[in-house]
Curated annotation (Swiss-Prot):
Organism superkingdom: Bacteria
Name of this chain's protein: Aryl acylamidase
Any further remark recorded for this protein: Also acts on 4-substituted anilides.
Organism: Nocardia globerula
Enzyme Commission code(s) on record: 3.5.1.13
Reactions it catalyzes: an anilide + H2O = aniline + a carboxylate + H(+)
Gene Ontology terms, MF aspect: aryl-acylamidase activity
Subunit structure: Homodimer.
Top EC class of this enzyme: hydrolase
Keywords annotated in UniProt: Hydrolase
Length: 28
């Protein structure tokens, strides 16, 4: 995950991406 992707999501959105397996917690 790059900075632009990170900035495009709030905490809830990031948690959803992790839950769906699109990114790992380490990436975030």
């Amino acid at each position: 995950m790059d900075v632009a992707e990170y900035a495009a999501h709030d905490a809830t959105g990031l948690a959803e991406l992790i839950r769906e397996g699109q990114v790992s917690a380490c990436e975030v």
